[in-house]
Amino acid sequence: MKHRRKLFLTKDIYNLPPTDQVFIKAMKDNIAFHTKNCPEYKEILDGFGFKLCDLNSVEDLWKIPPTPTSYLKNKTLLSKPYDKLLIRTTSSGTGGKKTLSGYDKSSALCALSMALKVLRFHKLISLMRTNYIILGVKPDKNNQTATAKALTYFTILAPAKKIEYAVKIVNSEYQVDVDSLIKAVVKFGQEGRPVRIIGFPAYFKLFLTELIARGIKLNLHKNSKVLLGGGWKTFFAEEISKEELFAMANETLGISRQNFKDHFSTAEHPVNYVACENNHFHVPAFSRVILRDVNTLKPVENGVPGVLNLITPILSSAPYGSIITDDIAVLRDNCGCGIASPYIDIIGRVGLSNIRTCTQQASEFLKNL
């Protein structure tokens, strides 16, 4: 997959037009590989009447039948044996269903190259020894979720002195150890080293609320950072705006606004989307994003809400080149931060009862091309 290698060597990561041709070639290579190595995926594409010759430019990417993430939680699609993958993951399994995924060596190298470029651009790489608060559980043989691995993965961005996990395993059960967490952050503050807090926004809010309840106010090192991602999920009733959360944290921890970063990625689409200074998720050169009409699945124009379709050739381990989520979003231009590419504004979720099955919806959509 030489075109994929070339794409993931891109240095100007938010300048999309110069990469359009290599992106479409990489996607064609990706689809050809998966149809050869994943019979179930080939059957899906054949059933929808899709042919590689349909792809001639990035404007044709919408013709690729998008696979719903909900479908992948019920059906495993892999192009290489799961137990042979270099890195094996599952999705977080909200609702009790999980997606099996992972990286072979070539996919992992592409992911590493991409991550270093994106995270360096957003000034998240440092050589300073740093203490970490991970608002999650440490990955082990019993916990292979992409979320757990991603939280720990972010600790390589600055050399770790100490890592404190919020969730501990006690008698084979997960328990939140609030006292240890509070003691750790107070100790970290006294040490005078940078502190990085990583996790879900809901967990971060609960952490801040506990600090406030105990009357604890800190002024952490000026290079301390907060990296959040994953949304509020089952804690939607607790949701507050990002600006409220940032203000709450600044008051409690003394971390400046520019050191808060929101991050977006999924097990099925492992591309790094990191928020800009205006807190927007810009599309990097390693992916393309389409918003689709919820009823017809046809693409809508920028500025019009639609179901989020994420496209990337990063994985040769699984045929997840074009996946459709249950998120409703808008693709917008002209952020004002200086980044040229459009950005994703996620505004809500579609209930599963409102989404027809992959085969029914996609086949109807393709028949009308």
Q: Predicted segment positions?
A:
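Active-site glycine/GP-rich loop and adjacent strand/helix microenvironment
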Residues: M1-Y14, Q21-A32, T155-L369
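Active-site diphosphate/adenylate-binding microenvironment
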Residues: P17-Q21, A32, K36-R88, K98-Y103, ...
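Short coil/loop linkers at secondary-structure junctions
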Residues: G49-K51, I125, K217, I255-S256
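Generic beta-strand structural signal
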Residues: I87, M128-I133, R193-V195
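Conserved catalytic-core segments centered on acid/base and nucleophilic motifs
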Residues: T89-S92, S101, F207, S265
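Conserved adenylate-forming
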Residues: S92-T147
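Short, amphipathic alpha-helical segments
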Residues: K105-L109, S113, S126, K141-A148, ...
